[in-house]
Every structure is written in C-alpha cells, then in structure tokens.
C-alpha cells in the first residue's frame, strides 16, 4: 500500500482539499500479506501521530454531516469513510458519493469491524490472532479492550504470536534476487511457511 505524505500538520494554513495540485512531500509504502494489514502499517508510517482509523475523531458528526463530509476530498477522507461505516451508512452510498471502489470500502469496513469486536467482546486468543493478522498494534488493542499494552504483549508471547520476516520476491521467482528486501508480520501459527 502506498499513501502520500501530506504535511498539513506542518503547513496548518494550507487548504487540506486535494486536487490536481501537488501537495505531497513524499509517500509511505507498506507491505503485508493482506491489504488490511498493509493499510494499517501505512497509516502508522505517516508520522502524523496516527495509529488506526480512529486517530481523527469524527464520531460527533451526525449521519447527515458525514454524508456531506464524504464529498470533501482531503487527507482525512479515509477516517471519514471509517466513521460513516461505523454509523451504518451503506457501502453503496459511500461509493456513490466518493466513487471509491466497493472493494476498498469493504477493506476499511473489516478494520472498523475489528475495532468494534475489540471494544465489545472479551479478548480471546482467536480475536487477538485475527487483530494481529490485520496488523492492529498492541497499543491500539490495549486501548480498545481496556487492557494494558503489557497485558497484550504477554498474551501474544504466551500464545506464540511473534514477528517473522518474509522476503519480497522482486524477481517473480525467475531467479534469485541479488538484493532482497523483507517485511515483518506477526505469525500466529507454529510455522511461518503456512
């Protein structure tokens, strides 16, 4: 996943709306074995003090206000879409307003569903494994479950949920890469080769 780095945190007087004018000062790229996890990693990599789709709080907006806010194309749009999903606005309605493909809206919904599950269900090993599979960081899981980050880490370690590094196949398996690069993910099975 690639996300442009839009430095509105530094240029606070700049208009946040996105048009054809160049406003990005760079980009972040993240790699995971699923889109949701890559999106979560990319959001955290923006270095804008965000760690999940709740980092910008739009919960006070009514459904009508969210529908209007969805029309604004800016750097906070993904967070508005997440809040619209939380408030029950249909994927089709979000698509009609934003013209964003339903596939992407569904992936954002998977992340909001995990937030909801972490807030409302007891934290089981299976729920923790699923949250880690889609790259929810320990601090976010702790915040949503009301536990401490140390409790989450201990639960992870006790259940064999640990980091592994996978190589990116840059040569499409035609030949061995001379300068391979790797990405990290948390594995929940005994073997990282599953």
Describe the predicted segments one by one.
Residues 1-3, 131-153:
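Phosphate/diphosphate-binding loops
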Residues 187-194:
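Conserved small/polar residues in nucleotide/adenosyl-binding loops
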Residues 123-138, 174-186:
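Intrinsically disordered, low-complexity basic tails/linkers immediately adjacent to helix-turn-helix/homeobox/MYB/SANT
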Residues 1-117, 121-127, 134-135, 163, ...:
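ATP-dependent carboxylate activation and anion-phosphoryl transfer catalytic cores
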Residues 142-145, 151-186:
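C-terminal amphipathic alpha-helical interaction region
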